[in-house]
Amino acid sequence: MNYRQAYELSLRDPEQFWGDAATRITWRKPPSKILDDTEAPFYRWFSDGVLNTCENALDRHVSAGNGQRPALIYDSPVTSTQRIYTYEELRQQTALFAGALQSLGVGKGDRVIIYMPMIPEAVIAMLACARIGAVHSVVFGGFAARELAIRIDAARPKVVVSASCGIEPTRVVEYKPLLDQAVDMAEHRPERCVILQRPEAEAAIQEPRDIEWTTLMSSASPADCVPVAATDPLYVLYTSGTTAKPKGVVRDNGGHAVALHWSMENIYDIGPGEVWWAASDVGWVVGHSYIVYAPLIVGATTILYEGKPVGTPDAGAFWRVVEQHGVNSLFTAPTAIRAIKKEDPDGKFVGSFDMSTLKTLFLAGERLDPDTWHWATDKLAVPVIDHWWQTETGWPIAANPYGMEPMPIKPGSPTVAMPGYDVRALDDQGHEVPPGKEGALCIKLPLPPGTLPTLWQDDDRFVSAYLEQFDGFYLTGDEGHVDEDGYLYVMGRTDDVINVAGHRLSTGTMEAVIAAHPAVAECAVIGVNDDVKGQVPRGFVVLKAGAAIDTDRLREELVRSVREQIGAIASLREVDVVPALPKTRSGKILRRTMRAVVEGRDEPVPSTIEDPSVLTALRSGA
């Protein structure tokens, strides 16, 4: 079946298409019902199927005689450590930690927060939750205490699994003090905290709440896989929304396993025994889908890399990993390639390593600018494939289906919509716009398997955030267009979520921190273009009347507050003091107009603006 046939079948007869795809995974009870639309718009896939995701990722490969195949390669330049786990070893460790969680009272449906760096134990903890039907919620290691506390209250975990520290190229980040602060701030109290001690920074243990990983494992008995319904949640992943309260994206077990298996074979062209490297973090959706679950479900070898594209030790770090481990396909964010290009513009490091095993480079997480695409294509001499998806979808919306039918690449486009995704560009009235014209990118319901069925304990917000604006469509929050060949072009967000180095951050959350400063009357944070990170936040503040504070001191205090309350990942560096913010007559801040002014673009002034002279002051300061 070629791409066009597969795509048309998926829209015309989704039950046949996804029913066939579902035969590629292992079921305890195969589904007889493929798509359940009885409670639309809450669609459910494989609603009467029963399976276990950990069994699909580990046990079935061991049972098939492939237990000695490498499952996970841990490569940590920051600790000078490397370790290979076979499928059998990873299964044993996962079963043991699953039993350890059971000994702490964790069972089917209970939540477990995982707050860890890029170490094998993070993967083991995720798979162990899946093994016993518990619901994991991974929080990016080193996220600020306040953000962690919000997620503790939202997920209400029985147990938190953490490590004593994470390791950056220039410093050790102690996690335990952040965890302790978060638990103190949160209203919900986790019953136990499991702490993996790392030699770089030992954590103080608070008994009886805290227990060390090694102590817990030493008395644990291995747990068997617990069968769960296909529609039971596998995990909740919190993503930045346009309000301070993060959205808990729910991933179900059945649709997730089916979609990820399909994507590995048909998009990424990776199968059993091949070496796959998603250079991301387990705290983000790419880490969930393509470091942990998808490569293991298809029986590939996945690489877990605790390092950076540059600085661990240099801009050749990625190419060293490719050579040393025989990587067949690499997936990272454009930011990583831009960082390497900045340090090594001529690509000298690329030529220092044997890259002959590498057949493709996949990029996603933010818009891929054509300059970066050309550089990577030229230096690596392999297809560089842009693709587009979201935390909410869990797997690509648009891609070049390399495993099915490689298509001509158009720089600046993530190619075409994948099966199950009926993508349209709509105008403000919900009408489809002609090819080449910008609109809100939306997906006609139902969404395919593997995408979010709802938000955690918040059906109303799921509807209001994604389904309300255009009847019968899911709102991606991105704007763009479709060309005459059906290729998609994604131009940017339509809301106040910005994309910093492939990480989604809410400007609203940053604004809340800045607005709390006693000298600030009001503020706005916008995302501005950055050569390396894609976007970085820039703050604009209006001072309270009579506020006597040095501008440089104010800037330092605000940058520090954002770093402490949100985390270094926020990357706020620039804060400008302005006399007023441009607003509509209804009081809405014109962020898009502000972005255009700051970036020097000539954009029409909205007719709804209250005071056009405010833009003049902004231009003189920009």
Sequence positions of predicted segments:
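AMP-binding/adenylate-forming catalytic core of the ANL superfamily
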Residues: 139-164, 179, 323, 330, ...
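Conserved AMP-binding/adenylation subdomain of ANL enzymes
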Residues: 257-275, 285-329, 342-348
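Conserved ATP/PPi-binding loop(s) of AMP-dependent carboxylate-activating enzymes
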Residues: 416-420, 431-466, 505, 602-603
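Structural core segment of the AMP-binding/adenylate-forming
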Residues: 127, 131-215, 326, 333-334
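Conserved pre-ATP/AMP-binding loop-to-beta segment of ANL
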Residues: 68-70, 193-196, 206-238, 245, ...
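Gly/Ser/Thr-rich phosphate-binding loop
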Residues: 300, 328-329, 341-408, 422
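Conserved AMP-binding/adenylate-forming core of the ANL superfamily
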Residues: 54-55, 72-127, 144-149, 205-215, ...
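AMP-binding/adenylate-forming catalytic domain of the ANL superfamily
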Residues: 191, 195-197, 532-535, 564-589, ...
